[in-house]
Amino acid sequence: MNKLYRSEKNKKIAGVIGGLAEYFNWDASLLRVITVILAIMTSVLPVLLIYIIWIFIVPSERDMK
Protein backbone atom coordinates (compact mmCIF):
# COMPACT_ATOMS: atom_id res chain seq x y z
CA MET A 1 0.00 0.00 0.00
CA ASN A 2 1.30 3.44 -0.93
CA LYS A 3 2.00 5.97 1.76
CA LEU A 4 1.65 9.68 1.26
CA TYR A 5 4.87 11.62 1.77
CA ARG A 6 6.64 14.71 0.49
CA SER A 7 8.91 13.64 -2.33
CA GLU A 8 12.64 14.26 -2.07
CA LYS A 9 13.47 13.43 -5.68
CA ASN A 10 10.46 14.97 -7.42
CA LYS A 11 10.13 18.34 -5.78
CA LYS A 12 10.18 21.98 -6.79
CA ILE A 13 9.44 23.71 -3.48
CA ALA A 14 8.67 21.29 -0.66
CA GLY A 15 7.80 18.07 -2.47
CA VAL A 16 4.08 18.16 -1.70
CA ILE A 17 2.89 17.96 -5.31
CA GLY A 18 5.62 15.46 -6.19
CA GLY A 19 4.56 13.26 -3.30
CA LEU A 20 0.92 13.43 -4.34
CA ALA A 21 1.89 12.55 -7.89
CA GLU A 22 3.86 9.53 -6.71
CA TYR A 23 1.03 8.47 -4.40
CA PHE A 24 -1.57 8.55 -7.18
CA ASN A 25 0.92 7.43 -9.86
CA TRP A 26 0.33 10.59 -11.92
CA ASP A 27 2.68 12.86 -13.80
CA ALA A 28 3.94 15.54 -11.41
CA SER A 29 4.02 18.21 -14.11
CA LEU A 30 0.36 17.64 -14.89
CA LEU A 31 -0.54 17.83 -11.22
CA ARG A 32 1.44 21.07 -10.87
CA VAL A 33 -0.45 22.59 -13.81
CA ILE A 34 -3.76 21.52 -12.28
CA THR A 35 -2.70 23.05 -8.97
CA VAL A 36 -1.79 26.36 -10.59
CA ILE A 37 -5.09 26.47 -12.49
CA LEU A 38 -6.98 25.67 -9.30
CA ALA A 39 -5.05 28.37 -7.45
CA ILE A 40 -5.90 30.96 -10.09
CA MET A 41 -9.56 29.97 -10.05
CA THR A 42 -9.78 30.25 -6.25
CA SER A 43 -7.80 33.48 -5.86
CA VAL A 44 -4.63 31.63 -4.76
CA LEU A 45 -5.12 31.89 -0.99
CA PRO A 46 -7.00 28.61 -0.33
CA VAL A 47 -4.56 26.53 -2.38
CA LEU A 48 -1.59 28.29 -0.81
CA LEU A 49 -2.91 27.67 2.70
CA ILE A 50 -3.54 24.00 1.97
CA TYR A 51 -0.05 23.66 0.50
CA ILE A 52 1.57 25.26 3.55
CA ILE A 53 -0.44 23.09 5.93
CA TRP A 54 0.55 19.97 3.99
CA ILE A 55 4.22 20.92 4.30
CA PHE A 56 3.90 20.49 8.06
CA ILE A 57 1.45 17.58 8.15
CA VAL A 58 2.75 15.22 5.46
CA PRO A 59 6.06 13.60 6.42
CA SER A 60 9.12 13.80 4.22
CA GLU A 61 10.20 10.80 2.17
CA ARG A 62 13.38 10.45 4.22
CA ASP A 63 11.31 10.41 7.44
CA MET A 64 9.34 7.47 6.07
CA LYS A 65 12.43 5.29 5.63
From Swiss-Prot:
Pfam families reported for this sequence: PspC (PF04024)
PANTHER family: PHAGE SHOCK PROTEIN C (PTHR33885:SF3)
Cell membrane found in the keyword field: yes
GO CC terms of this entry: plasma membrane
Keyword Transmembrane listed: yes
Species of origin: Bacillus subtilis (strain 168)
TM spans (from-to): 37-57
InterPro entries attached to this UniProt entry: Phageshock_PspC_N, PspC
UniProt keyword list: Cell membrane, Membrane, Transmembrane, Transmembrane helix
Full protein name: Uncharacterized membrane protein YvlC
Membrane topology term: Single-pass membrane protein
Compartments reported by the entry: Cell membrane
